[in-house]
Swiss-Prot record:
Signal peptide limits: 1-24
Keywords: Cell membrane, Membrane, Signal, Transmembrane, Transmembrane helix
Location (main, coarse): membrane
Localization per Swiss-Prot or TrEMBL: Cell membrane
One GO cellular component, as annotated: plasma membrane
Organism: Mycobacterium tuberculosis (strain CDC 1551 / Oshkosh)
Mode of membrane association: Multi-pass membrane protein
PROSITE patterns given in the database record: PROKAR_LIPOPROTEIN
Protein name in UniProt: Uncharacterized protein MT2350
Phylogenetic classification of the source organism: Bacteria, Bacillati, Actinomycetota, Actinomycetes, Mycobacteriales
Length: 246
């Protein structure tokens, strides 16, 4: 029998951002800076970020560093994104998000139009191991108050039809060793489901402190994605046999 499965599910929350437009003098002509709108996609720890980056086509110069945090520019299914790893906990998530908003403004030609968080978490109620949940609203105070996610993004999620894997396999999805046989670790024995709607909950387990990363902390506690996104770029490699002089 395989190793015990951890009770986890994938959760995603999205928050739309409004844009204000100020009236200008019709006779005034200004230099308009193109402002590309992107979605900020956040994950807490390396295993989560690696999963997102495995589906991200990176830009030619993908890495932006701000306040010692790395942001990765690219596209997911043709949609422009900024991918970032926050670190564990709400304080780290807040700091990473605030840094992103300070760095990516129209003055830099890239702005954030929406925020989405993707990661693993404990499940309750109708969810089971391996299920994917996209809540319609979120609470940070154990249900005292709720805040709804973006209606448009939630409506898009409600149109999704996906088939989820029920087998956990060994190996990293972005490993270059494509010819290595797949090793099956666990079989759920059921078909995981996608749930759109309902409630999601987050809470601060670190007493208002930023949870520290750990050097060489692996896929959970490290400071950056385990598989560095630069490795996703196509780099030509030539192998040749050494020839003895003769």
């Amino acid at each position: 029998m395989g190793a015990p499965l951890r009770h986890c599910l994938l959760v995603a929350a999205a928050l739309s951002l409004g844009c204000g437009v100020a009236a200008a003098d019709p006779g005034y002509v200004a230099n308009v800076i193109p402002c590309e709108q992107r979605t900020l996609v956040l994950s807490a720890f390396p295993a989560e970020a690696d999963a997102v980056l495995a589906h991200t086509a990176l830009d030619a110069n993908p890495v932006v560093v701000a306040d010692r945090r790395r942001y990765y520019l690219g596209s997911i299914s043709g949609k422009k994104v900024i991918v970032a790893m926050t670190g564990i906990g709400l304080v780290n998530a807040t700091n990473t998000t605030e840094t992103a908003f300070a760095r990516f403004t129209c003055a830099s030609s890239i702005a954030i139009a929406a925020v989405m968080f993707s990661g693993v978490a404990g499940g309750a109620g109708r969810t089971s191991i391996g299920d994917v949940a996209i809540p319609a609203r979120w609470t940070l105070d154990n249900g005292a108050t709720f805040r709804g996610v973006d209606p448009g993004m939630l409506a898009t999620a409600q149109t999704l039809s996906v088939v989820l894997d029920n087998i956990n396999t060994l190996g990293n999805p972005v490993c270059l060793c494509r010819n290595v046989p797949v090793v099956r670790l666990n079989h759920l024995g059921r078909q995981p489901q996608l749930f759109v709607g309902g409630d999601g909950s987050s809470s601060d387990k670190n007493n208002g402190q930023a949870f520290p990363c750990i050097p060489n902390g692996g896929s959970v506690f490290a400071a950056n994605p385990v598989v560095h996104p630069i490795a996703h770029l196509a780099i030509p490699v030539t192998f040749s046999r050494r020839r003895d002089p003769g």
